Amino acid sequence: MLARNLRCLHPNTFASLKTNVSYHGVKCLASQSKRGFKVWADVPMGPPDPIFGITEAYKKDGDVKKMNLGAGTYRDDAGKPYVLPSVRQAETELLSQKLDKEYAPITGIPSFRVQATKLAYGDVYESIKDRLVSAQSISGTGALCIAANFLASFYPSKTIYVSDPTWGNHKNVFSRAGLTVKSYKYYDPATRGLDIKGMLSDLTSAPDGSIILLHACAHNPTGVDPTKAQWDDILKTMQKKNHFALLDMAYQGFASGDFARDAYATRLFASSNVPMLLCQSFAKNMGLYGERAGCFSILANDAEEAARIESQTKILIRALYSNPPVNGARIANHILSNPALREQWAGEVVGMSERLKSMRKALRNILEKDLKNKHSWKHITDQIGMFCYTGLNPQQVDVLAKQYHIYLTKNGRISISGLNTSNVRYFAEAINAVTSN
């Protein structure tokens, strides 16, 4: 109403209202807008996200041979985003149901939670379901945020140990929740493999009852996973020290193509009565990156304790985002609960996993056999999943970007999904050039 009245005023009359216009009881000082607000003057400029920064640099590069090996999203052999046919089919079938857009419960769609946790825990599920608390989350990061806030509120220890190195956002999520973040040894640069002795030593040295974050499969960023025997040793150390296991499983099925194999650690811990919680994501194995479908689950001692944990989880989620989005969870639930679609999806996951394995083999073969590079590249095929820790140093990474228009993180991590039959030789030749000097 005021806006309409002001537009009807003569310009000279409007000009006289410089400092005393009142709108809905709030005095508007026109002269103050000229001075600007000083309340945010001390907010420092934050550093750009390293992964999204790589993507921006890639987009600005006009070279036809440019490569983006930083982003953790799957690409097909043509370098294009890949929407799984099973996901397309699920969307079509869901659309025909004309579902509403009402709020989901605070902990999400119940059937999705059941299907997600069954996928994760497998044969162990039936023995733990009565004391398992679950909540649909905003993908894996959302599950980690629920976990971080719950542990900060209710777990005695306020220190969490993460692998060195770990996913870049882990430290941010847990420190923002008020937890102290420390690290344990994980990657051995000399062997480009797992430093199991250092890891077990650090877990033993940590105070009893510490929170230990473990990558369930396809370790990010190294691609280095423990063997089953090493997982057994890790479990024994965790039990001896009464540590709390926080398992981050973002790549089930996507790592090896085998859902059970990728969930080995999760099921081992769940069946061994170790205090634990699990964070799941369907971003990678269903390609639901923008749909943000995930699941948080935590094991209680009994059903009564589970009820109390669930009540606090609901309060926590209500404060964070109230209710999770429904579309991604509906897609995932539809696939998981439909035998034919589930079988189709499983085959597509195997296909994605096999393509990544083939790119690892091709890269190694070109470097070692075709180019006769003086270094060993065995670690490329020893590692697993979407990422590979190449061993390239920051200086070599800079040369790759400036001279070859190839973009990856400073620590030498590459996303294998960025490689395809058209560009893998170019990348190998670039690596050969920067490592031969």
From Swiss-Prot:
GO biological process: 2-oxoglutarate metabolic process; asparagine biosynthetic process from oxaloacetate; aspartate biosynthetic process; aspartate catabolic process; aspartate metabolic process; glutamate metabolic process
Function: Plays a key role in amino acid metabolism. Important for metabolite exchange between mitochondria and cytosol.
Family: Belongs to the class-I pyridoxal-phosphate-dependent aminotransferase family.
Miscellaneous comment text of the record: In eukaryotes there are cytoplasmic, mitochondrial and chloroplastic isozymes.
PANTHER family attached to this UniProt entry: ASPARTATE AMINOTRANSFERASE, ASPARTATE AMINOTRANSFERASE, MITOCHONDRIAL
Chain positions found as N6-(pyridoxal phosphate)lysine: 284
GO molecular function: L-aspartate:2-oxoglutarate aminotransferase activity; pyridoxal phosphate binding
Entry GO CC: mitochondrial matrix; mitochondrion
Annotated catalysed reactions: L-aspartate + 2-oxoglutarate = oxaloacetate + L-glutamate
Protein name: Aspartate aminotransferase, mitochondrial
Sequence positions that bind L-aspartate: 72, 167, 220, 413
Main location: mitochondrion
UniProt EC number: 2.6.1.1
Top-level taxon of the source organism: Eukaryota
Subcellular location: Mitochondrion matrix
Swiss-Prot/TrEMBL keywords: Aminotransferase, Mitochondrion, Pyridoxal phosphate, Transferase, Transit peptide
Pfam families linked to this entry: Aminotran_1_2
Cofactor: pyridoxal 5'-phosphate
Quaternary data: Homodimer.
InterPro entries: Aminotransferase_I/II_large (IPR004839), Asp_trans (IPR000796), NHTrfase_class1_PyrdxlP-BS (IPR004838), PyrdxlP-dep_Trfase (IPR015424), PyrdxlP-dep_Trfase_major (IPR015421), PyrdxlP-dep_Trfase_small (IPR015422)
